[in-house]
Amino acid sequence: MAKLTKPKTEGILHKGQSLYEYLDARVLTSKPFGAAGDATTDDTEVIAASLNSQKAVTISDGVFSSSGINSNYCNLDGRGSGVLSHRSSTGNYLVFNNPRTGRLSNITVESNKATDTTQGQQVSLAGGSDVTVSDVNFSNVKGTGFSLIAYPNDAPPDGLMIKGIRGSYSGYATNKAAGCVLADSSVNSLIDNVIAKNYPQFGAVELKGTASYNIVSNVIGADCQHVTYNGTEGPIAPSNNLIKGVMANNPKYAAVVAGKGSTNLISDVLVDYSTSDARQAHGVTVEGSDNVINNVLMSGCDGTNSLGQRQTATIARFIGTANNNYASVFPSYSATGVITFESGSTRNFVEVKHPGRRNDLLSSASTIDGAATIDGTSNSNVVHAPALGQYIGSMSGRFEWRIKSMSLPSGVLTSADKYRMLGDGAVSLAVGGGTSSQVRLFTSDGTSRTVSLTNGNVRLSTSSTGYLQLGADAMTPDSTGTYALGSASRAWSGGFTQAAFTVTSDARCKTEPLTISDALLDAWSEVDFVQFQYLDRVEEKGADSARWHFGIIAQRAKEAFERHGIDAHRYGFLCFDSWDDVYEEDANGSRKLITPAGSRYGIRYEEVLILEAALMRRTIKRMQEALAALPK
C-alpha cells in the first residue's frame, strides 16, 4: 500500500500514515487527501478504499476519474458538486454487492462509453436492502444498459429509496435496450422524482421480473420511447405496484407500458404528443390482468406526427390476453382513435370521463378499434362514455338498475322518486331474455304497464293482467269482448278494410232468440232518417265544405221509445258514454288538462238497420195480408 504524504493544509494526517490508517481516522476523499479529482488522474484506488472502509465517504468538488469499482458498501455523498467519471469506455462502472443500508447521494455519475452500442450499467445495486440513492445526476449517457439498475443477488433488492434522479441520454434509437432506472424484482421500494430525457426502449423507470409492492411516483419523461415500463420480456411480470404522477412529454411510442403484470395501480398520467415523431401514439398499453389505470389525459394528436406522417392514436390499448383491467381516460385530441381492444382481450372496462372532441364512440370512423370484442357475453369488453350517453357492452349480457326492494308510499310519488329518460329524438331500447322480455313503465302514482315480447308477439298491457297483442297475422285482445276500438271522447275518424267485419253470431254465444216485438217496431217507426253535418267539421272546413252525412239522431230515437214506454238504454243500438277530466303530467310534474269531462250519445247502425229491415218486413207482410183479404 502506498504511503500518503502529509497534506499542505493544517495537519490532520501524519507522515508515513497509510491510506487505510488515514481513512480510518478521517474517511474523507478530496484533493488534499489523496484523490486528485482533476478528471485525469486515476482515483480508482482511493475511492475503492474509501468505500471499503465502511465509513461515510464525502466526494468534494472535482471530477474523480476511476475505472469500474466493485464494493459491498455504499456510502458516497458528493455535496452536490462532485463528479465520478468512468475511465473505461466499456462495462459496468459502480457496482454495489448486497449493501445493507447506505446511500449514494448528491453526486454526478458520468458515463464515457465508446459507442452507441456499448453495454454497461452506470450504477448497479446487486441485491441489498435499505439503500438510499438520492439526488444523482447521470451525464453523458449512451450505449445499452441502465443509468441505475437494481437486481437480485441471492435475494431481491428490498427497501430501496431512489429519489431525485436526473438522466439525459445521447444517441437515441428506437428499441435500443437502455433506460434510466430499472428495478428488477425489487420489493418494498420507493422510486420518486425522476426526470429522464431522450431514453430509448425502457424509458425513465422500468419495473421488471417479480417487482412488487413498490411505489413509482412523480416521473417526467421528455422525448423518451416510453416513460414508465413494466417489463414484458418474460412470462414473469411486475405485480402489486403503485405508479402515480407520470408526465410524458412527446414520447416516441407509449407513455406507460403496463405490461403483462397484474394488480398494478397506475394513476394520474399526462401525455402530450404535440411535437412527437411517433407513428404509434398510445397513452397506456396493457397486456396483463386486474390492473387499474386511473386518470389518463392525452393531448397533441391530430392524426399526423411532427414529420407529417400518418399517426395512429389510442389513449388505452389492450393487447393480446389483457383481461379484467379498468381504465379511465380523457382523450383530449382530435385524432379519431380512443380505445383499442386487440383480439384475445376480454373483460376490460374503459370509462371515457370526457370524450374530448368526439360526439360518438361508434361513428363511421370508429374510435373503438376492435369493437367486435364487445359482444355482450361474460367475456365482453365494455366502454362507458356518460357525457355522450353511451354505454357500450355488458359483461352480464344485460343492463340493470337494480335495488334490493321497492315499496310505493300510499300517496303519489314526488318528482325526486321518478326515473326519466327524456329526449327530442327517437328512443331505441332493446331488452333480451329467453322467449319473453319486457319493459315496465311507471307513472308517478305507482301505476305500471308493460310492453313485452312474448313468443314472437308484442303485447301492450292494459291492466295488471290484460293486454293487446300484435301478432304476425292479427291484433287481438287478451280475451273476447273486453275492448273497444276508440272511445266516445276519442273516436276514430274513419277506417279502411278489404272485407267487412265479422261479428260473432254463434248460437252457442247467445240466449234463446226472441222475435222482435211489435211494440219495438212501432217505436222504431217514429224514428226518422235525416241528413246532417258534423259541427267540428263545419268549424274546421266551413259549412260549404263540410260533407253531408245520413243517419238518425240518437236523442230522437230515445224519445220515440220513451213515448211507447220503452227504455231505449236496454237495447244495444243506443249508446251513452261519459268521462271525467283527463290530465297529462309533463316532465316537471305539472298536470295539464287534455280532455275535459263530458258525455256523448252514439248509435250502432248495424242494429238500427236490422230494426228498419224488420219494420219493412212487417209492413210488407201486413200489406200482403191486406191484399190477400180483398175480395177476388
Swiss-Prot record:
The record marks 505-506 as: Cleavage. InterPro entries: Pectin_lyas_fold (IPR012334), Pectin_lyase_fold/virulence (IPR011050), S74_ICA (IPR030392), WH-like_DNA-bd_sf (IPR036388). Keywords: Degradation of host capsule during virus entry, Degradation of host cell envelope components during virus entry, Lyase, Viral tail fiber protein, Viral tail protein, Virion, Virus entry into host cell. Its EC number is 4.-.-.-. GO terms for cellular component: virus tail, fiber. Changing residue 253 to A: No effect on enzymatic activity. One of its GO terms (biological process) is symbiont entry into host cell via disruption of host cell glycocalyx. This is Tail spike protein. The gene is kflA.
